[in-house]
Amino acid sequence: RLDHYGVLDGARVLDLCAGSGALGLEAASRGAGEVTLVDSSRGASQTCQRNIRSLGLSGVSAVTAKAATFLAGAAGAPADLVLIDPPYELSEEELTAILTPLVRSEDPWLAPRAVVVVERSTRSPEPTWPAGLERFADKRYGETTIWFAEPA
């Protein structure tokens, strides 16, 4: 579906709460130029590293850090696509702590036409979008809701 938004070709992608890195690795396989996989679990980051090596994808790196901690650092080049698939037990406050730095006024993480994708349980409320980030679509798949947002 992200292919339809035209955001993957050469894109800079952040996969936050990456787990095995499946979402970010899929983006890399579909033409993303640079992918950063971020997960707080050392085991998950090691799995990401193994998956990167086994797939032979260039431009993909894995970082062991909490997403909010990673985002507190310097942004560098802005991201065109941010994928956030946190554990379902992640609190709404913790999710907001991840979303908020994406749109900070100094050194923002998002490119002007970026897409932010948040995957949550259908039992979870809609994310609290910080000022500067606006939902433009959502899609429900069984017990999962995927929310799409963009810079406002």
Predicted regions and their residues:
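Class I S-adenosyl-L-methionine-dependent methyltransferase catalytic core
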Residues: 1-152
